[in-house]
């Protein structure tokens, strides 16, 4: 049953929506296998991801069955101490100003060599750190690992022509199929290098 059909039924809400398996599949496919917030791998199996309500159900009940309000998120260290939680688990009922499905989030972000993700925009940076907690050690280490691999490649290809760098970017962002976890780190770094080549 589609969300639209279910929404038109009497006493419908997200809890009694029965096609969550199909919904998980659609979200994972649309997001190409990555968490909407941290870029970790998600899969459509129950217990391997969460269906995130960008506008939380508690404050925006009218949007709980709106597909444009739904995202696929990782489990975000659910059940662990608050300071280790991230993504939807950490966000809970807090509001986010930017929806990653409707906004070019990547244009607001940069990465440090230690894997830290940050933004020059004050409120965006606050939400990255305080609401989503995207700089927990686990996530920083994963981003650093991707960046280290790119830096190692760059050592041997720093004089490569633009076409070769573009092909490397395309490996991280192919036109179809699943994306590499934390790929945006590599795409960001390589794109910056590419922009400097004349």
Could you say what each language-model-derived stretch is?
Residues 1-34, 60-65:
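Short, charged surface segments at domain edges that flank catalytic/cofactor-binding sites
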Residues 19-20, 31-41, 48-51:
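Glycine-enriched, solvent-exposed interface loops adjoining structured elements
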Residues 30-33, 49, 67-69, 104:
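Short connector loops at helix/strand junctions that flank enzyme active sites
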Residues 40-85:
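Histidine-centered nuclease catalytic patch
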Residues 60-68, 79-115:
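Polybasic, low-complexity binding patches
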Residues 122-198:
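C-terminal, charged low-complexity interaction regions
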């Amino acid at each position: 049953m589609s969300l639209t059909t279910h929404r038109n039924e009497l006493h419908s809400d997200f809890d009694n929506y029965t096609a969550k398996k199909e919904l998980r599949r659609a979200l994972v496919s649309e997001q190409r296998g990555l968490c909407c917030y941290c870029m970790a791998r998600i899969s459509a199996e129950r217990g391997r991801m969460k269906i995130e309500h960008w506008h939380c159900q508690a404050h925006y009940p009218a949007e709980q069955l709106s597909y444009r309000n739904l995202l696929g998120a990782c489990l975000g260290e659910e059940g662990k101490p608050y300071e280790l939680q991230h993504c939807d688990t950490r966000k809970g009922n807090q509001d986010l100003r930017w929806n990653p499905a409707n906004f070019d989030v990547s244009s607001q972000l940069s990465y440090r060599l230690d894997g830290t993700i940050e933004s020059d925009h004050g409120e965006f940076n606050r939400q990255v750190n305080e609401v989503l907690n995207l700089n927990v050690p686990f996530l920083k280490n994963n981003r650093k690992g991707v960046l280290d691999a790119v830096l190692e490649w760059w050592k041997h290809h720093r004089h490569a022509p633009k076409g070769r760098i573009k092909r490397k970017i395309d490996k991280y962002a192919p036109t179809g199929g699943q994306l590499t976890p934390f790929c945006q780190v590599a795409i960001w770094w390589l794109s910056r290098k590419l922009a400097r080549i004349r």
